Amino acid sequence: WSSIWVTDEKTKTYFTVHGRPEAYKKMSPADVAYYDGCVYIDLSTVESTIAMPMHPSNTYTIHELQENAEDILHLIQDNANKQIKGAQMDIVSKFHDGAIWVEQGEIAGCAGGTFDNICAAADILRGRSCGNGAFSLSVYPGSMPALAELMKNGRAHDLIAAGAILRECFCGPCFGAGDTPANGEFSIRHTTR
C-alpha cells in the first residue's frame, strides 16, 4: 500500500518556518494516473478516538468514553484480569465524580509531538496549572527544529510555567520508554501506539 497526499499551504509554511522554503514542492496526482483502487477518507468526519488497555485495537471514540466511562472501564478491567492470570487491575477506581481521573499525561512522538499539536497544548495551558502534585505532564517534541521553534515562539515557556516537563526529542515514549507510571497510576498519552 502507498498513499498520496497533496501538498498545500500548510506544508509550504512548515518548510518556511523550519528554514527550508526551497524544499517545498507542490505535489498532486498526475492527470493521467492509474491506481488499483482508492480509499477516500474525509478527515473532517473522523471522530477522535482513544486506545484503551490491553491492545491498540481496543478503541472508543472520545464521545463514547465520556458517555459510558464507568461501563467501559469495568469491561477493560474485567478483560484484563481474565487475560493476565493473577493480576488484579483496578482501573474502575479511576472513575469518580463523573469523570476519569489520570495521574500522568504525555504528549510525544511523531503523532503527538508535532509542532502544531504542542502549540495547541501550550495554548490550552497558558496561564493555568496542569495540576502540580496531582498530575504530571511530559512533553517530548518530535524533532529538534520543532523544539527550537517552540522555544522561539514562547510555547515552551507556557508549558513549563504550567508545570509541564519539557523533555528532549527522543524516540521511545511510544513504546513505553521514559515516564513509566507508578504502580496503580493511570497514564494518558498522545503518542503513536
Say what each PLM segment does.
Residues 1-193:
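Fe-S-dependent hydro-lyases/dehydratases of central metabolism
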